[in-house]
Structure formats: C-alpha cells, structure tokens
Amino acid sequence: MLQQQTQSPGWRVLNRDVIKYIAMTAMLLNHIANIFLVPGTLWYEVLVDIGYFTAITMCYFLVEGFRYTHSRKQYALRLFGFGVVSQVPFSMAFAQNGILEFQDFNMMFTLFLCFCILLCIETIRNRFLRGVLIVLLIFGSLFCDWALLAPVFTLLFRWFGQDQKRLRFSFALSAALFGWLNYTSSVWLYPTAQCLLMACGSMAGIAASGFVILYLYNGQRAARGKKFSHWFFYLFYPVHLLVLGVIRVMG
C-alpha cells in the first residue's frame, strides 16, 4: 500500500498477518482491562492503552483490503455476518449488570460501516448523494464501538494512505485527536496532571500502530497458513468475547 515500502526492506520484517496477530493480542488485553479491572488504576490504564493499537490498525488494513480484495461483496458480507454473530458475545462481555446488556453495536459493525463509506467513495458519482450517504454512515457509527473515530481513521487512510509522508500525518492527527478526546472526557473525573498523563498514554497505541505500519510492515501476507489466518481473525473476535463474557458472568 505504501509507495516507499521497498526502499528500506531490511527494516520491514513484519507481514500483514503478524501485525494482525499483534493487534488481536492488544485487543484481548484491552478487553480484559475493560471487563475486569478498575478504571484509573495503573494496570487498567496500561492494558487499555496497549489495546488502542488495534482499532486504527484494523482500519488501515480495511482500506488496504478494500483496494485488493477479489470480491468486495463477499468482504462486506463477512463483516456484517460476523457483526451479527459477535453481538451477543459483545453484549455479554461488556454488560454492567446481569448476563446481557445492549450498549452499542460491536466493532465488526463499525468496520462494515467504514467499508460502506469506501464503497460510496468508489462507486457513487453524484457528489451530493455520495456526501449525504457518507454522513449518514458516519452518523450510524455513533451507535457502534469506536464511534466516529473509526470512520475518521478510514477516511484518512483512504485519502492519504498511499503516500508515506501523508500517512505519517494521518497517524499523528489520529493520535492527537484521540488524546484530546480522552483528555476532555476525563478532565472532570481526575486531576489535570493525571488527565494529561492518561491522554498521552491513550495516544501510545495509535503511535505504535503508526510506527509498525510505517517502518516495519513489508506489505506482504504470510507465506504459509493464509487461509487459517484469514478465518482466525474473524473467529477470534466473537470467540474471545464469549469466553470473557462467560468468565464475567461466572465470576
């Protein structure tokens, strides 16, 4: 996806699947913290911040996958289908009371909306209609995990993702925006110095994603186990949520 990926091959040692496995691990740590740990504590903040690596990484690979997939229809159906499959485990894992509690739609639905935004940009020629549909899709993300932010990440990667310098700007802007949102949402709950520290910490996962993709990603898929990795990434999401949800309920 990056025009300059071949200029420094010695540094680019991570393929797409390895980065996705890292993202899945980071997401698991984030979810463990959100479900089982007390907000504001050291380990909560550390694990949650590590997990912020995942969403922006998935948005980047969504844009890349959109460009190179053999079937955009099948891609969209997979995202929507696994969104449906994941909703009960998601509602179970993050319920505040009882076994199930609906709070918002899961990240698979968010990625589906982001995919639809990309489809609108690519296929709808009428600028007014295209703009209206994109705004509606962004509005729809308000009811999903990573509301507004995931569409913003996706649009930035769509516009700037094929140029190294602009991609650096996209990650920097995303990190700054996320840090600012975290600061403004916590400023009434914690002392100012702690809010600033937490905001800086929240930017670390996005910054790490930017470093990995900009400087370590070689633009390739794993040479072996492509089919296994492909389905593992989809299945891991609902399965790990179900396991965490069962542990929460039993605990």
What are the language-model segments listed below?
Residues M1-G251:
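Alpha-helical transmembrane segments and their immediate juxtamembrane cytosolic regions
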